């Protein structure tokens, strides 16, 4: 199967590898350069063009579900991506961050396999895994909580456990929600996001140890900002 055919099927990992962000991935050692070199960059007439999930008209993986782990689950990846996913696991091992590896590759992936029976949204699933809050609670109870972590797009109006979550936010006011201004440069926010996204929009933050901050921020950027201008890459 050619690269073109793979990309046309919206394989999420191939899309990342073939995007301008692949150089950033190599810089952060999440993908080896020799692997990234096998995939051509997408050429875009507008280098500043990007899109923010969810995307209307796309399938389940790109539309309503808030968990970035949908994009990492090898259940939905084609064989070429599964091999890349295996190598990505190796790269995470090399980062010597066992907590973040376990969190990404085991906890919510288990939730994903149990809760998503197909690519079609169901009325009972809404936009929240049943295990998400429990896992997040376990994470926040760790004594070494800091400002590092993983960003997940979140829509409060869609949460089916709102009361529980609001009490959760009250307990951790600084670690539950953080404004976009705190993670994106203000010039970029004003020039690129102002017409698309209100400044006050919120993104759910899964805190981790301080040493994971770069990894968490990179994951947020990869899955929620597509084709981000190189000038604003961290």
Curated annotation (Swiss-Prot):
It is found in: Cytoplasm; Nucleus. The keyword Nucleus applies. The keyword Cytoplasm applies. GO terms for cellular component: mitochondrion; nucleus. It comes from the Eukaryota. Its main location: cytoplasm. One of its GO terms (biological process) is mitochondrial tRNA 5'-end processing. Keywords: Cytoplasm, Nucleus. This is Protein rgg8. It comes from Schizosaccharomyces pombe (strain 972 / ATCC 24843). The lineage of its organism: Eukaryota, Fungi, Dikarya, Ascomycota, Taphrinomycotina.
